[in-house]
């Protein structure tokens, strides 16, 4: 197995410098974004292209600063009980992009959608630390109001956990836990994410979505921290083919892209080294065994033997060569409270 790496080509420094040159000139960031998003509904979407856009449009109770530290998002502060099982979040008095107040009811509604099996979301498991979340997601409890979250008043949310969960605040930075505008979702149904309908609470709001062409976001004048948002417009360009996307970057059509063909990494390192950034990605690649039939079914010793035989250093250093790190477990490095597992045979 190998831990994943994130590759990024960016001319962002050049784009940002334009802000300093002219305080009144509109600054635009053109982002290559891989495949066309299927949806940008926070509780339904899955995949990196969708997440990139949603994190610009929506803000959860917590968020991260530039150093990846947990900081307040739409919740300006929170209290944690002595036993670590009760969190009380105090929301900012802010609004949705249509001017409607964002309240605790929107947070409760979003979390109930997240674990509702009828909604069809993929990330409800992130809320499993919350009381009754797993039972609701698995259909054992039908009443969504039994989820361990409630609005104490318009701007206070209380969450009850099954057990103390040290990483709970980290989980809340995921887009799937962001509040959604109940008044808009219930009015428009699945069409609520269309440009003419969508309402968001993040640093940006959507102004256009032309399928397979571009998605345009503009700085939101209702965002509580709008004065720190320095880029006026972000345009996401979907490109299914990585080679095409890198050509668009090199032609100056894109300011940044994460979609880089592995076979071009060496050339990019040699020729665009000041623009190429490779860093750890929170994920793990692995080989899976078919456990429904022989020889791997009911044969853990064989599976273990194959795992021992795989030279992870050869795979990461000679075959993929993008900078991945050898992996000896499913949990990648960088998880708070996790000590990297390295078995004795790794050094043989």
Feature annotation, model-predicted:
Residues 325-348:
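Structural transition elements
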Residues 106-108, 119-183:
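Surface-exposed binding/hinge segments that line
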Residues 35-51, 74, 122, 168-178, ...:
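A structural "hinge/loop" feature
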Residues 76-124, 158, 248, 296:
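Aromatic- and charge-enriched surface segment that lines or borders ligand/interaction sites
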Residues 154-155, 163-229, 233, 241-243:
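Gly/Pro-rich hinge or "lid" segments in bacterial periplasmic/extracellular proteins
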Residues 104-110, 154-160, 202-203, 231-233, ...:
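Alpha-helical secondary-structure segments
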Residues 32-82, 112, 197-200:
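N-terminal lobe/hinge region of extracytoplasmic solute-binding protein
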Residues 207-218, 235-294, 317, 326:
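Extracellular/periplasmic solute-recognition and catalytic clefts
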